[in-house]
Structures are given as structure tokens and as C-alpha cells.
A protein has these predicted regions:
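A glycine-/polar-enriched beta->alpha junction
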Residues: 28-38, 45-59, 74-77, 85-103, ...
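Short beta->alpha connector loops
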Residues: 44-46, 67-70, 247
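Short, conserved loop/turn and helix-capping segments at secondary-structure boundaries
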Residues: 77-81, 105, 175
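C-terminal segment of classical bacterial N-terminal signal peptides
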Residues: 1-3
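Small/polar, glycine/serine/threonine/aspartate-rich low-complexity segments that form flexible
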Residues: 6-20, 52, 63-100, 209-224
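Periplasmic alpha-helical coiled-coil/stalk elements that build and connect Gram-negative outer-membrane
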Residues: 6-7, 21, 118-240, 245
Length: 256
């Protein structure tokens, strides 16, 4: 929360308004609460556990057999019974364990790149939805100003009609224009409502808990160098996921 000093020297901390969200807050909500992203995060942990398990030796088998425990006479009970204990350990030959571990490690990398790809998709969706809300808010605001101007113009024309300076048809035209602005306002408010729902759905809320968003349409960021863009294009998680998926399929063939 932002803080500033009062004139008396005390520090005042301004609390964030939960009803007004920024792009940063919207992104944080989506990364923390998006159900699809959470599912991919769980898949990552499952793959990590499988990779760890595949690197371990299979659990040994323990068998205990008791013979002649149900005899008769002097052989009744466990006094004359024979107990056999067998311990078995599976030993995999032909590099099977190493191949299985490699396949699981590659599958873990696929899950990791899938998560990164989905994370980028969510970030893109949040940014687009946020811009739609901000744009819809501005449209509502501009339409409100048009209605205010149209109302003033309608009243002004009415006064001129009363004074006999213009024909009554002019006030009728002004009324039609004002009605058109009001219809546009209804459409703008509906678009804003839909945009707010779309944004809140990126973090799993069917109905938005916020009232408005705040941001700057006209903030200009420096253009990155072409070399850095080329490197990022090669290192995208989408391409890396595709490569890892090819390796995973080959590893599964080797495992068979």
C-alpha cells in the first residue's frame, strides 16, 4: 500500500481499495487462483514425484510361510512348525530402470513447459480482458458526457423554440439525438458488465467482486532490441514443450 507523510510528520498508510484493481493485481489474482493453471501445477508435482520414484530400486518382496502349524497330537501348534522367510529383490537388466527414469524425467520437463505455456496463455487472457474493461469504462464515461451535452442542447433548443427563434422540429431532432445517446449508454454498460465478468473469470470468479479497474492506455514502453526478440522467439515454452514431447515419445519407444 502507498504511504506518505502528513504535515505533522506522522506517516499515513493508504489502504488499497479492493473494489478498484490494477493490471498487476489482476495478473496476481489469475496466477494464484486460475483453476486451469492450478491443475497444471498439480500435474507438475505429480511428474516430479514419479521421476523421484523411478530413480529408486523397486521395493523388496518379503514372504513368510509357516508349515505343519495345524498338525495333531505332539505336532499340534507352532512347537514343531517350520517357518520359511523369503526376501526377493527385482533386479532390472538391460538398463530398464535408467530408461524409465529418463522417460519420467522428460515427461516432467514436458509438464513443466506445458505449465509455462499455459501461464503465458493466462497472462495474455488477463491483459486482453483488462484492456477490454478499461476501454468499456472509458466508453461509458464518454457516453455520459455526450448525454449531459445532449441534455443541455435539448433544453437550449427548447428555450429557443419558446422564444420563437427556431421551429419546434429542431427540438424534436435534439430529442432524437439525446435518445440515441441514451441507447448507446445502455449498450456501453452491457459491454462493461460482460467485460468485467470475462476478467474475473480468469481467476475463477463467475461474478466480479471489483467495481472498476485503473490503468493508463497511453503509457509507452521502450521497444526492445531486435536481437533480444529473436532470442525470445527461439526460447518460447511452446517450442520447448514441442521438443520435449518429441523426446518423451522417443524415450517411451526406447523403454519398450
Amino acid at each position: 500500500s502507498p504511504a506518505f507523510a502528513k504535515q505533522d510528520g506522522t506517516l499515513h498508510i493508504e489502504k488499497d481499495n479492493p473494489k478498484i484493481i490494477t493490471l498487476e493485481k489482476a495478473v496476481a489474482n489469475a496466477l494464484l487462483k486460475n483453476p486451469t493453471l492450478s491443475a497444471h501445477s498439480l500435474e507438475k508435482r505429480v511428474r516430479e514425484a514419479r521421476t523421484l520414484q523411478s530413480g529408486l530400486l523397486p521395493n523388496p518382496r518379503l514372504e513368510v510361510n509357516v508349515d505343519d502349524a495345524l498338525g495333531s497330537g505332539p505336532f499340534n501348534g507352532f512347537d514343531r512348525s517350520e517357518t520359511t522367510v523369503q526376501v526377493g529383490q527385482l533386479i532390472e537388466l538391460g538398463g530398464k530402470r535408467g530408461a524409465r527414469e529418463n522417460a519420467n524425467r522428460i515427461a516432467e520437463r514436458v509438464a513443466d513447459k506445458t505449465y509455462e505455456s499455459k501461464r503465458l496463455d493466462i497472462l495474455t487472457d488477463v491483459n486482453k480482458a483488462f484492456v477490454e474493461v478499461l476501454s468499456s469504462q472509458n466508453k461509458v464515461k464518454l457516453t455520459e458526457e455526450l448525454i449531459e451535452l445532449g441534455d443541455k442542447f435539448f433544453n437550449a433548443v427548447g428555450e429557443r423554440v419558446k422564444a420563437g427563434k427556431v421551429a419546434p422540429i429542431e427540438q424534436t431532432k435534439a430529442g432524437v439525438t439525446l435518445s440515441t445517446f441514451k441507447i448507446e449508454m445502455a449498450h456501453a454498460k452491457l459491454e462493461l458488465k460482460q467485460a468485467r465478468r470475462k476478467l474475473s473469470s480468469t481467476w475463477g470468479n463467475a461474478e466480479p467482486q471489483f467495481v472498476s479497474v485503473t490503468g493508463n492506455f497511453f503509457k509507452i514502453y521502450p521497444v526492445p532490441l531486435l536481437e533480444s526478440l529473436q532470442n525470445k522467439g527461439v526460447e518460447t515454452p511452446y517450442l520447448e514443450r514441442w521438443k520435449s514431447e518429441q523426446e518423451r515419445r522417443q524415450a517411451m519407444v526406447d523403454l519398450e
